[in-house]
């Protein structure tokens, strides 16, 4: 399954795991709930630097992620399979680059 949309990028990825055990638990939990209400699809901590550098260099940038598991499904007691196969994510990224190259050539 593929999704396109907003992803939260932060500097404390592991703050989302057991946030109630952290000194700023109230803040972490409230921020995550706010991101969910805004339609955020996932959380990660690598892409922000790429987008900053791309903006500075005035070049396009994009990101493709493999969502390994869904902590929200887990909290609800739903099936939460863990994915490790990166093949689909790689194919999506390659196809996106092909489309950009084609558009640039037109």
What annotation goes with each model-predicted range?
Residues 1-106:
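Glycine-rich phosphate- or other oxyanion-binding loops that anchor nucleotides, phosphorylated ligands
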